[in-house]
Every structure is written in structure tokens, then in C-alpha cells.
Amino acid sequence: MTYHLRVADLPSSDRPREKLLAQGARYLTSAELIAILLGTGQGAGKLSAIGLGQYILQQLGQHQRDPLAVLREITPQELMAIPGIGPAKATTILAAIELGKRVFQSKPTEQTIINDPAVAAAALGSELFWQAQEKFAVLLLDVRHRLIGTQVITIGTATETIAHPRDIFREVIRQGATRVIVAHNHPSGNVEPSPEDLALTQQLLSGAKFLDIPLLDHLILGNGNFRSLRQTTKLWEECPQGD
């Protein structure tokens, strides 16, 4: 595809708006999604809207950076420093980014049934995704796995957080929950469990079994990704919870 061609001159199947309507947004490249927001490119003989979208990503991806990670936190001034991006285009892009954050971080309503790790991760997204400090939180559920509430238990540093089983189960009991999911974030974005994460999970499983409050999962979240330790370890086989 030639990025200097006007979008209107492209075959309809290659035009971002038409492609989105026909195939769905997930099938568009990042440059094509940006092109829809931009509306126009740099003008006749210069970059088209798609070309400008690609150029923005190239500029943000310098020095081996993830361009979308940079775009997530970019300022208006940084965007407008890119040739072809004025106040109108910059504010449109920033508004779309903020709307995306709010949609992603929206919590399930009370009484939502938490029956899947992805639903649990979404319920904790606003507290744990894209955070600069490690946080440890709990999802409090009733016997039918309906959401009672969420609670951040501890806040640590950029590299570690300290959560004691005593503090975790105190909150669970105080809220009257009969099932619990625990979660913490890794600010680095790497959701691989550390030896300390696994050791804490073992302690929590033992405590949950003793208290007859099943621990349904331990999630690790970071930069929009998550890992379910129940699905990826054998810890629940070693200490069944009767849930």
C-alpha cells in the first residue's frame, strides 16, 4: 500500500472505515485505527491519513520503545511536535485514548458473577493495571461467586509489595465473603510469578482451607495482561479448596 495515496483513492476494501464496518475493528492495523481518528493526512502529495498514522507509530517507536505504550501516556505537546499533528488531531487522539482507558477499566456491577479469570481481571483493572506501584487486592465473593466488592489490601514500591495472609483474610471475614480471589500487579508488565508469589499463594491456599473460605484464584496483572495461577500452576491440585 502506498501511504501517499489519498484514502479516497484506495480500493474500498483497503479504506479503514469501510474495512472496520465489513470486518470489525480488531482486523485493522494500529495505523489504520489512527487514520480513522485523524480523518485527513498532511495534504496533497504528502502522507495520507494512513501514512501519517504509520509515521506517528514510527516516531513513537524510536529507541526500541513500544509505540502504543508511549502513545498511552503521551502529552498534547509531544503529539503536536510530530509534523502534521495540530491541536485538532492531537485532541482527537488523546480523547480516544482516554475513552479506551475508561472503558477497559470500568468495573462489573455489584452481583456480577465472577466465573472466569478474565472477568476477575476486569473487575480489578482500575486498581491494578498500568500502576507504577505494586498493589495487592482481593475480590470478595459470595457462595454463588457473585461479586460483593473489591479491596486493595496493601500498596508497595515499584518492585515489590508485602501482603500478609492475616491482613487478607481479616478483610475477607470483615466483609462477610465466603469465596475470594486475590490479585496483585507487576508494574514491569511481566506477569510471570516470582518464587515469592508462589510461596504466598501456597500460604493463602492453606489458610483458606483452614478457614473454609475457598481461594478461587491468584491473578497477576500488568500492562493490560494477566496470568491465572490456578490455570498455570498445580498449586490448587496440591491444596484443593472444595469450591
From Swiss-Prot:
Listed CDD domains: MPN_DUF2466
Residue window of motif JAMM motif: 184-197
Residues annotated for Zn(2+) binding in this entry: 184, 186, 197
InterPro entries documented for this protein: MPN, RadC_JAB, UPF0758, UPF0758_CS, UPF0758_N
Pfam families per record: RadC, UPF0758_N
Single GO term (MF): metal ion binding
Keywords for this protein: Hydrolase, Metal-binding, Metalloprotease, Protease, Zinc
Domain MPN: 112-235
GO biological process, one term: proteolysis
Family according to the record: Belongs to the UPF0758 family.
PANTHER family membership: DNA REPAIR PROTEIN RADC, UPF0758 PROTEIN YEES-RELATED
Protein's name according to its UniProt entry: UPF0758 protein Cyan7425_1778
UniProt source species: Cyanothece sp. (strain PCC 7425 / ATCC 29141)
